[in-house]
Amino acid sequence: MIRRMALALAILAASLVAHANEPAKAPEPAATAAAPAAATPVLSADALKGQQIAAGVCAACHMPDGNSVIPINPTLAGQGQAYIYKQLSNFKAAENKPAARNSPIMNAMVMPLSDEDMKSVAAWFASQTVKHATPAKDEKLLAAGQKLWRAGNFSKGIPACAGCHGANGAGLPAQYPRLGGQQADYTEAQLKAFRAGDRNNDAEKVMRMIAAKMSDTEIKAVSDYAANLR
């Protein structure tokens, strides 16, 4: 009996020594946690109402989310809410007062909209993400546009566009519009309208005075460059 116990203890001791001499194993890696899904933005009641209005009134020209696919029609997605509201208000004629901004199409489209409707539409488009326009590829023109955007043209008294619209074209929502990613054809048309005086709803005539100093080539260059900004 004693011999059997001694033998069993000897075997156990040998087993423990053998395990002690084995190299340590690295712990099994923990399962990688799945990345949390991106939170869906919560839209205000105004924006939700604006979505419904935009679907029936604006989508044909500007698309339901405001990302225009027609070069001459502006992209409204991501534009400043206050700026969109101002433009819609300017398109609408009041009693005994003509519209501050002229466009046969837009003047007619805003006619049935109330002030609250226009605020809601502005809230909807401002809440959307801009999908940038197809970038221009004329490197020489883009270089000229970049120079104007960043530094202006001192000899002609043209200030840098970035001074008001930002280095990346995001603008200042309550004052200056987003031009980064905007349709180049639309920006070009508006600068020419300011230059000709056909558009005159700019504060203190700032855009009219600047555009009046710009050549067609400069307008084209800066419009193409702005469309490429991200």
Regions found by a protein language model. Give the residues of each.
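N-terminal export/targeting leaders of redox proteins
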Residues: 1-44, 89, 228-230
